[in-house]
């Protein structure tokens, strides 16, 4: 099967590199190029053969159609042509000339474009409106402008003027295409069109102002390409003729008063090139085209056409907006103000760039916004923000600095303000988080510091404040962005206030702990001496108690003031603390005194004092009462001396009034937990009321009487002792029994066992425990006897009255004495 057609179709659909180079070669005849394009049309679409990769789908674009409408597709096409991101690294060239003079063919040969060319057999208009196509050999936008002097428009020159104005405002180089034989003619050489160009140029750059020298970007190069040059007329003559014609046209223009002396070279540079006849001399034509192309591509050549002075300084990504604005003003016949158009373009593009940059900036900042809002301190946030700002401004500067400088600077300031406003909540949030964390760390530092042995609270607080401030300032300075009006002094002042509040609270707590510790020490130092003094009451008892109290309080105050220096307490705080300490110490003394003046304690003290006087002599030896002793006198003396001590417990009454302490104010108790009732200074020195004294006196007298009866009974029992002769009777009568025990083995063994047991008990020291057990048993037996006696003598009124009295818990000896007293009375009756 013959597959040649299929292979040919594949080659046309995906032409090899050699075919593409052949199609792009300017020396390839138009007829051959057109034939290949027609063959490729069914596979790759019209007009794509021989175009570079970036422009395969859309090699050219009609930016202004025959209805004078500007296209909306210029920006997408610039992107397809890989020119949208070139910045200023691109050039624009346009061609003028009469209709059907080979302008499109010239552009296709020079730049490798794909503009439609005229069908030579029909000689009719080919280019309608304004077309644009990228160069194959450089970053150049080529505009093919509809030819002038065409029969289709006739005498309507409106579009010629508009296209000239548009091209002059947009391009760097104007190529004027004319035949050699047209030089010297007015209409044939497009002198009318050139006059229009000059007039338009004056309208654009010469209106108003006193400056006769245009700015560099206001200059344009006019390149005359002389076609079908056969060499009969030297090129220098042709150049001179065209230059003279240009100057004559320039001089004939009606100029403003301030531009009367303006010369052509201030606004235009003239350049010339000649091409041989395309049909008669095709090889030389192609060589001349290649040479001319070098002037557009080789920057090292002296005659390089795209000089910086000609560039309109419009970034590539703003070309579409700029040209559309130019055309709209041209279309509405308004005065075209290029600087205004450039400013409008700059505003539009700067706003677009700013929006894109700001959105990217917000996306970057989003990653830390949530942690900051959650209360966390983000490490290195300042560096991150500065990096975001630098990146955003770098992108903006890269893309927007190409536009109008004043607009760019203004928009940059606006963007910077927006960026700063967006970062300000992060700055404030970071400061608040630093504030919160530093206050927490400060509290922990104080708690840890007061646990150290021998700590100085003032040093701990100052050191903690210093560290907290240093950490806060370091974090605040790190997060502060340059060129902002952000301040952290207010937050620092709030931090200082919070640190002071925390320090004051901790100082109050530590002061309270110190006062409590001193109070406990005061209690320990007061309570024991008070108890000792009141257990041995004398007339100077209160002097001893109050002197001890005064010394302890004075030492406690000195200890407090010594420690309070490190707390930086104020005089008012010291006064309050000392008042609290004195009040608590006084209340502690009062409670101890009330404890020592309770009924049981006072009775015990009186009984002990009475017994020491009644039962013991001056040498402290226990008394054994004999019949000749005056027991009544001793009893009365001991009783009276003891009762004389009872009033000492009634009031705090030192021998010197100066020993009485200063009472705390009559306010609620300082020790609410122990005594929630208010302090009453009117009863501060009263311990026992008169009623209480009478009750204690009565109870003591009963105890003393019981002691007297016991002493009396012991003296009677010592008088009624066993006679001596009774012992002789016992020996005589018990002799036989004793002999029986000694000579009876069983009884003798029992006696030996008892003797050995007694010896062992004495040697092991068990006599005391055995006697204690025996006394307990005897006490129980005695209680049973007393109970039986009560039952037996229940009918006797006096015995019933005495036995009905409650037994106090003073001691078992008191109960015994009362029982003996009852039995003695019963025996007397």
Swiss-Prot record:
Domain of life: Eukaryota
Biased composition (Basic and acidic residues): 814-829
InterPro entries: G_GB1_RHD3_dom (IPR030386), P-loop_NTPase (IPR027417), RHD3/Sey1 (IPR008803), Sey1/RHD3-like_3HB (IPR046758)
The keyword Calcium belongs to this UniProt entry's keyword annotation: no
GO BP annotations listed: endoplasmic reticulum membrane fusion
Coiled-coil stretches: 487-525
EC number: 3.6.5.-
Physiological role: Cooperates with the reticulon proteins and tubule-shaping DP1 family proteins to generate and maintain the structure of the tubular endoplasmic reticulum network. Has GTPase activity, which is required for its function in ER organization.
UniProt name for this protein: Protein SEY1
Protein encoded by which gene: SEY1
């Amino acid at each position: 099967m013959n597959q040649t057609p299929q292979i040919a179709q594949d080659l046309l659909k995906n032409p090899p590199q050699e075919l593409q180079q052949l199609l792009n070669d300017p020396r390839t005849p138009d007829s051959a190029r057109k034939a290949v394009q027609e063959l490729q049309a069914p596979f790759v679409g019209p007009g794509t053969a021989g175009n570079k990769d970036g422009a395969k789908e859309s090699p050219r674009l009609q930016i202004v159609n025959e209805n004078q409408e500007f296209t909306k597709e210029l920006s997408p096409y610039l992107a397809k042509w890989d020119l949208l991101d070139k910045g200023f690294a691109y050039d624009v060239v346009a061609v003028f000339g009469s209709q059907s003079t080979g302008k499109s063919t010239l552009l296709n040969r020079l730049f490798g474009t794909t503009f439609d060319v005229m069908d030579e057999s029909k000689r009719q208009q080919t280019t309608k409106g304004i077309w644009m196509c990228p160069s194959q050999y450089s970053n150049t936008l080529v505009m093919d402008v509809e030819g002038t002097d065409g029969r289709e428009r006739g005498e309507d020159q409106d579009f010629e003027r508009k296209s000239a104005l548009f091209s002059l405002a947009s391009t760097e180089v104007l190529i004027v295409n004319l035949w050699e034989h047209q030089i010297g003619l007015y209409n044939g050489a497009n002198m009318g069109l050139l006059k229009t160009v000059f007039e338009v140029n004056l309208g654009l750059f010469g209106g108003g102002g006193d400056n006769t020298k245009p700015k560099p970007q206001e200059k344009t190069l006019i390149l005359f390409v002389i076609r079908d040059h056969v060499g009969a007329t030297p090129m220098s003559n042709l150049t001179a003729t065209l230059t003279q014609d240009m100057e004559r046209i320039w001089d004939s223009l009606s100029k403003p008063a301030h531009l009367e002396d303006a010369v052509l070279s201030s606004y235009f540079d003239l350049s010339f090139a000649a091409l041989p006849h395309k049909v008669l001399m095709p090889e030389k034509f192609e060589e001349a085209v290649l040479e001319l192309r070098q002037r557009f591509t080789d920057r090292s050549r002296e005659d390089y056409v795209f000089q910086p002075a000609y560039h309109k300084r419009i970034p590539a990504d703003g070309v579409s907006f700029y040209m559309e604005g130019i055309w709209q003003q041209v279309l509405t016949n308004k005065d075209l103000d290029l600087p205004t158009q450039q400013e409008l373009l700059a505003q539009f593009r700067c706003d677009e760039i700013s929006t894109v940059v700001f959105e990217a900036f917000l996306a970057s900042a989003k990653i830390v916004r949530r942690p900051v809002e959650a209360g966390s301190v983000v490490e290195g946030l300042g560096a991150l923000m500065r990096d975001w700002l630098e990146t955003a401004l770098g992108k903006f500067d890269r893309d927007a600095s190409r536009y109008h400088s004043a607009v760019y600077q203004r928009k940059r300031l606006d963007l910077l303000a927006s960026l700063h406003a967006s970062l300000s909540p992060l700055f404030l949030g970071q400061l608040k988080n630093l504030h919160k964390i530093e206050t927490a760390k400060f509290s922990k530092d104080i708690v840890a510091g007061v646990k150290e042995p021998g700590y100085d609270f003032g040093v701990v607080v100052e050191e903690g404040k210093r560290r907290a401030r240093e950490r806060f300032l370091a974090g605040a300075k790190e997060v502060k962005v340059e060129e902002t009006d952000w301040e952290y002094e207010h937050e620092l002042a709030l931090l200082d206030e919070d640190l002071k509040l925390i320090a004051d609270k901790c100082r109050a707590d530590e002061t309270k702990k110190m006062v409590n510790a001193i109070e406990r020490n005061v209690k320990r130092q007061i309570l024991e001496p008070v108890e000792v003094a009141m257990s041995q009451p004398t007339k100077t008892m209160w002097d001893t108690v109050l002197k001890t109290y005064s010394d302890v309080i004075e030492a406690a105050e000195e200890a407090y003031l010594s420690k309070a220096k490190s707390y930086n307490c104020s005089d008012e705080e010291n006064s309050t603390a000392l008042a609290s300490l004195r009040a608590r110490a006084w209340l502690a003394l009062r409670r101890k005194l009330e404890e020592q003046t309770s009924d049981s304690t006072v009775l015990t003290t009186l009984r002990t004092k009475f017994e020491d006087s009644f039962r013991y002599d001056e040498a402290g030896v226990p008394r054994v009462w004999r019949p000749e002793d005056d027991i009544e006198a001793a009893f009365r003396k001991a009783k009276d001396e003891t009762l004389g001590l009872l009033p000492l417990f009634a009031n705090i009454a030192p021998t010197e009034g100066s020993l009485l302490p200063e009472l705390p104010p009559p306010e609620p108790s300082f020790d609410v937990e122990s005594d929630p009732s208010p302090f009453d200074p009117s009863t501060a020195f009263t311990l026992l009321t008169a009623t209480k004294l009478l009750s204690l006196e009565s109870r003591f007298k009963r105890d003393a009487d019981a002691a007297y009866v016991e002493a009396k009974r012991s003296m009677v029992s010592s008088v009624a002792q066993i006679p001596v002769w009774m012992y002789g009777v016992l020996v005589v009568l018990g002799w036989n029994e004793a002999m029986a025990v000694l000579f009876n083995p069983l009884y003798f063994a029992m006696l030996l066992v008892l003797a050995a047991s007694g010896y062992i008990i004495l040697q092991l020291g068990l006599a005391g425990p055995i006697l204690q057990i025996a006394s307990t048993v005897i006490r129980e037996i005695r209680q049973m006897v007393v109970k039986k006696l009560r039952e037996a003598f229940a009918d006797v009124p006096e015995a019933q009255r005495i036995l009905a009295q409650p037994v106090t818990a003073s001691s078992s000896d008191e109960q015994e004495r009362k029982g003996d007293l009852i039995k003695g009375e019963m025996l007397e009756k």
